[in-house]
Amino acid sequence: MKVRNSLRSLKSRHRDCRVVRRKGRVYVINKTQRKFKARQG
């Protein structure tokens, strides 16, 4: 999982990327290509 300051560029890397909030943190998840996971931090 990558940790990035901004997730704007990461959510456009793949069409299945979704931005979700969990426990006060913002994540990018991808069900089909799991290598695109990221967390904002």
From Swiss-Prot:
Molecular function as annotated in GO: structural constituent of ribosome
InterPro entries referenced in this protein's UniProt entry, alphabetically: Ribosomal_bL36 (IPR000473), Ribosomal_bL36_sp (IPR035977), Ribosomal_L36_bact (IPR047621)
One of the protein's GO biological processes: translation
SUPFAM superfamilies for this protein: Ribosomal protein L36
UniProt keyword Ribonucleoprotein, yes or no: yes
Keywords carried by this UniProt record: Ribonucleoprotein, Ribosomal protein
GO CC, alphabetical: ribonucleoprotein complex; ribosome
Source organism superkingdom: Bacteria
HAMAP family (alphabetical): Ribosomal_bL36 (MF_00251)
PANTHER family: 50S RIBOSOMAL PROTEIN L36 2, LARGE RIBOSOMAL SUBUNIT PROTEIN BL36B
Protein family per UniProt: Belongs to the bacterial ribosomal protein bL36 family.
Name of protein: Large ribosomal subunit protein bL36
Classification of source organism: Bacteria, Pseudomonadati, Pseudomonadota, Alphaproteobacteria, Rhodobacterales
